[in-house]
C-alpha cells in the first residue's frame, strides 16, 4: 500500500491516515470521518473513502460492512437510545394563535373532508419546547410588574456560554452582543450601515423569501449567485459566478446564510474560507444569518463565519436567535455578534433610530431558560429526531416519487423538492401538485418565492408518525403513478 496516496482530496487525507484510524478502532465510515475529516460533505471523496475502508476491513477480517456503507443518521441506531424529552406527542395547536396550523398558504384551496391538517410549511416546529423556557417565563410573571427594565448580566452570560459550548467561540464579550427584535431587522440595520439605498447586494439562490422582501422593501437591488448541485446532489457555491458578479457589478455588501435556508447546506471550513477571501478581495461587507446554526443534523458541524479568519471576524455582522432552535418566534428576540467596534456602534445606532428595537422582558427570560444546560441536552435530542425524519423523507422520496429530486439537508429541518421532471412527465403544473397536496391535508409551501421555479418547501419538524402519514398521503393521492 502506498501510504502517501491521497484518498480524500478535499482535506488531503492519505491512505496511511485512514489505515491508522482503522487500526485505532474505527470500524465505520462515520468513525473514520471523525478521526480524519475524510469524505466530510464531499460526495466523490466519500465514495473513495468507503471503498478504501472496505478493502482495509476485508484485509483485516473485520466484520462490519453495513457500517461502512450506511448513510449518515441511521434510524436503528437512534431507536436504541432512550429520549429524555418528548418528541412524539401530537400537540393540538388549533386556536392557540399558531399560523402553522390555522392558516393555509394558498388561496382558493381547502382541505377535503376526511383529512386533518398536517402543518409542513412555515419554519415552525410542532414539538413542545424545553421545559426550562416555560419555567423561566412563569417565574418572571409571578412578579406582577412588567415596567421598563435593563437586560440582566445573566442574559449576556447565557449567550456567551452557549456560543462557547456549541460553536467553540472563545473570547466573546458582552460588548460584542446586541439585541435585535428579529434577524431580518438586524439584516436591514446592518445593510443600512454598509450601503446606500439602491446599492447592489449579493445573495445565493435559492433564497430565503424573508431576505427578498426585506431587501426589496428597503430599496436594495438583489443580485443572485445561484448555488449548483453537484453529481451527488449536494448544493455547492459557484465561486466563479460569485466572483464575476462581485467584480463586474461592483458589489460591496452581501447577505450570507449559514446554514443555508432553504437548501440546508452546512458549509465546510474550506468553503467559508474561500467565500470570505472573495469578500476580502473585493471589499465586501458581510451580514451572516446563522439563526439555523443549532439545527445541525447527524454527521455535520456548524462553523461560525466570523471564526475562519481575523478579516472575517472584522467585516462580518453575525445574527443568531433562540427562536428557531426552541420555537420561540412568537416571543420575538434575536441578537447580533459584532467584533468590529466601529461597525458595532453604527449598527446599534441604526437599529435604535425608529425606537422599535427594544427587548421584551419575557423574551429575555425565555432565552436565559432556553440556554440552560437542559436546553443543550434538549437540542441534542431534537437534532437526532430531525435527522431521523430527514432520512425517512429523503429515502421515501427516492423510492416512491420518481421524477422528484431532493438534496439531503445537512442542517435545518426543511426539504426543498424539485418537481420539474415529474411535472413534465405527468403534464402537470406545480400549482396542480401543490393544490393536490393541500386537499389531502399536507400543508406545504410554494418554492417559487425561494427562487425554486418548480419547487416545494417542506417542514419536517413534527412527530414521526405525522411525517409518515404525510408521505403516505402524497404517495397515494399526489405522486401516484397512473
What are these regions (language model features)?
Residues 368, 384-394, 406-420, 454:
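Conserved glycine-rich beta-strand-loop-beta hairpin in the small C-terminal domain of fold type I
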Residues 146-277, 294-295, 302-307, 311:
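Conserved core of the PLP fold type I
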Residues 4-15, 36-51, 66-74:
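Local cysteine-cluster metal-coordination motifs and their immediate loop/turn environment
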